[in-house]
Amino acid sequence: MTDPRLTKWADTLASYCLDLQPNEQVLIRADEAAIPLARAAYRSALERGAHPHVQVIVDGLDELFLMHASDDQLDWVSPSRRLEYESIDALCAIIAPTNTASLAGVNPARQARAQKANSRMRQGLFERAGGGGAKWALTLYPTPGAAQNAGLSLALYEEFVLGAMFLDRDDPAQAWRDFSQAQQRYVDYLDGVELLRFVAKDTDISMRVGGRKWINSDGHRNFPSGEVFTGPHEDSVQGHVRYTFPTAHLGHEADDVHLWFEGGKVVRAEAARGQEFLEAMLDTDQGARTLGEVAIGNNYGVQRFTRNTLYDEKIGGTFHLALGNAYPETLAVNKSSLHWDMVCDMRPNAGGGAIYADGALIHENGQWVI
């Protein structure tokens, strides 16, 4: 990518997403292929008076660790990394997958074990962020592997990525502020709702959300963003949902996932492909069969499925439900080392769908009607 585009991206991360202030400690944690953006982000952080530190994740280390680590090593958490997560003011995570199938041959149970060991450290950062004590932003640098997954050339994928983040506009930060203001109207409405019901193809699922806090996800954490979300009451989810798109997690993919809920728990789960992995993730821990998040995608600049959740869950006209860990700022309490988002399309070309709030129609065939 050319320098001007990287500079605009990095400046938006520093000024809008993280709102870096003088003397704040910021960790820039980047995959190896994302070094150009990490370098630009480092400069932007310096220009704002922050204290940046860069960590580069070498390609292939995760696969080596999960294939060869002993059980003790899978359970071990680096004290230095834990201290870093406890002390930083901001985290900028830049994902750049060169091989999106690099973990496909890894035993899912080993992945779940390693993820569980590190979940407390991540949960601590989320709790600090929910209380205003820390900031984080996650973004995805385009690679040939990600472009191939999306069915696009690298050049077209780069344009897609830039458009999803509003980086093709003169003032991306102002565009996100305008978007945030428009999206806040939905948050204000949903904060007064007790019961939500989602109806779509092979889907009819209800949950209580009264007393929970809806979040306006407007690019300050996930970048790009464009969703409103909360955590449902843990024991309230009833019904079934059939997800439109294949869903990837930890390098594995499950296709045509259909889940049935009773009393807030998944009691039956089917996948046309990836059944073993789906069952392994559901058995990760006690909270893995409970929903930690319900969200509605509002970024109509994202129109196509790309096999990357960061973009797919934001598609305007979709909703997604996440199994496992809840975000503390929503006032939801489910805890799990798993957080797995799965997306259901409600647009007309997918068969349509509707969302009801306390019995009133609020969203139809991919569009808000309030």
Give the predicted meaning of each segment.
Residues 1-239:
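Active-site bordering "gate/hinge" segments
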Residues 42-47, 109, 213-214, 257-260, ...:
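Short, solvent-exposed amphipathic alpha-helical segments in soluble enzyme
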Residues 306-363, 368-369:
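Internal helix-turn-beta structural module
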Residues 232-280:
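Long, well-ordered mid-to-C-terminal structural blocks that present hydrophobic/aromatic surfaces
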Residues 268-332:
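Dual-mode signal for accessory low-complexity, basic/Gly-rich regions
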Residues 198, 260, 355:
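Short aromatic-centered micro-motifs
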Residues 33-34, 97-99, 143, 203, ...:
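Short, glycine-/Ser/Thr-/acidic-enriched flexible segments
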Residues 234-235, 250-253, 260, 285-289, ...:
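A structural signal for short secondary-structure junctions
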